[in-house]
Structures are given as C-alpha cells and as structure tokens.
Amino acid sequence: MDIVILEPADWRVFKAIRLEALRLEPRAFGSTYQFEAEQTAAFFRQRLTNNTVFALWEPGQSGKSGAARGVLGIGPFKGPQEKHKAFLWGMYIQADLRGSGLGSELLQTALDVAAKQVEQVLLTVTASNTAALSFYRRAGFEEYGKEPRALKVADSGYEAEILMVKVLT
C-alpha cells in the first residue's frame, strides 16, 4: 500500500472514496452522501486544489490503475494571524484496513508534510465515534473543547463534536 497526494486530475478517485465514506459513515462527517453525489467535477477538483489530500493507494493488478483505500485532507487557515494552523478533515479508512496500522501511517505522513508549513493541526471528531477519539489521542491530539449539537443528522438527531489539536513545533 502506498500513500500518495491526490491532484486535481484525480478528482474521480477522490469522489469515489469520499462518497463511500459518506455513505458508510454518515454520522462522522459534516457533509452528506446526497449533497456530494450531486456535485460536479469542478467541486472535487477545487477540494483537491485548496487542500492537500492524502490517499492510501492500493496498486492495481495486471496493469489496472489501482484504488484509494483511505483518505484524509489537510487545509490551511487563510487569515494572516492563523497561517500557523491547518485543519485535518475527512479521514476515512476502509473497514478491512482499520486496526492494521495503515491509518496511523496515513495520518503521520500527513502530519509530517504539514509540519513543514504549519505549527499545529486541528480537527473535530463526533463525540460518539469513540474509536476515532482513541485513534487521535494515541496520535498525540489533545481535546480542547466540545461543541454540542455540532451536526444535525437528518432523521436521527444531533452529534456533538470534540475539538482536538496537535502542536507540531
């Protein structure tokens, strides 16, 4: 398995893994499958242009191009007094790879790249996602707050989000 940075030309790969994540883990993300499934190629190209998106890449067999098996994005803050920060978003690893260490490798690769440009990385994780909370704590992220009712999940209520940060330098 390789870790690659997706380019705007890879928008179809990104869209496929992103839609899978939204379909299988709807309570974990601020967006929805329905919303992103309706978006154009330009939407996904823009996400790849404005962020650094890393993918766990499984090379294909017999000349096939391969597939993304996991993904995460890191986007910079834009304000002049916030350029020392980035936001980690959209982390998803296919179920059969969870617990294999590949998610940790993906995250660490992203943090190593981010450390060359920013001093700290922030993220949010739904309070009910205890596996993700444990994963980020093991990676050195610390909680600094909680936003109640952060996500309103259609027909199933609200999700609180835990705010986390990792200082890189």
Regions found by a protein language model. Name each.
Residues 9, 39, 79, 83, ...:
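Residues at secondary-structure transition points
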Residues 1-3:
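Extreme N-terminal starter segment of soluble prokaryotic enzymes
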Residues 67, 116, 159:
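Structured loop/turn residues at beta-strand edges in well-structured enzyme cores
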Residues 8-16, 20-96, 107-113, 167-169:
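Acetyl-CoA-dependent GNAT
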Residues 81, 90, 94-108, 126-134, ...:
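Conserved glycine-rich acetyl-CoA-binding loop
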Residues 105-120, 142:
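Conserved acyl-CoA
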Residues 119-130, 138-169:
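C-terminal "cap" of GNAT-fold acetyltransferases
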